[in-house]
Amino acid sequence: MDWDGRKAIEFYVSPVRCLKGTVLEPNFFREFRIVSEEKWRSASIRAHLWGFQFQLDTRWNPGLSDEAIAQFESEVEASFPRDFRLFLEEMNGTDKPAVDVRGSSGEPHRFGPGFYSFPRDLRRVQELIDFVHRGRTELCATLREEGFELSDEAALVPVYAHRYVVCAPNTESCPVLSIWDSSDAIVYGKSLKDYLEREVLDLTAG
């Protein structure tokens, strides 16, 4: 069935239909791209909130080829799970910087990358990978207290701000972690699908 923007929006209006745990439905990323860009066409900055927000008319960059994804894996020394590869095939980061809103502090807005794009943001991605690697032992202990076991072979690849995709070899799906530092980290999405619905569409499975 062909999906247009209206039908895709209807798909997401019903929490019963769209929130099905971690199951990745066919064409999910294509439908997600349509819905998220539709949302951003009417986006406004919420000045009372802290943190990164998407600008009006933000769009996803075109996806990567298999060769570019392989190069990305090589640059970050990771083997990407199937769902992360499918995500990158459909979209490669966002085109506009995200706005870092400072709430009611009186500080001016700042700007930074939205969803990271390869190779545009490779240097920043590598810096963030190095940052979490330096505190890996403490990070593993922090996550263990949260009930999540980070395996030794799992790589952490940032996807947006301080959100990291867990890239373990030979896996279909990947959890997403929010890591401020090695002592402040949580599981932010049980899967990439769960994370994207929460981060971009403000949907939570209740």
Sequence positions of predicted segments:
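A surface-exposed partner-binding patch
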Residues: 1-151, 155-157, 161
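Short, flexible beta-strand-to-coil junctions
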Residues: 91, 160-169, 180-182
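Substrate-binding/catalytic groove segments of enzymes
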Residues: 148-150, 165-171, 184-188
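Glycine-rich, aromatic-bearing surface loops/beta-hairpins
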Residues: 172-206
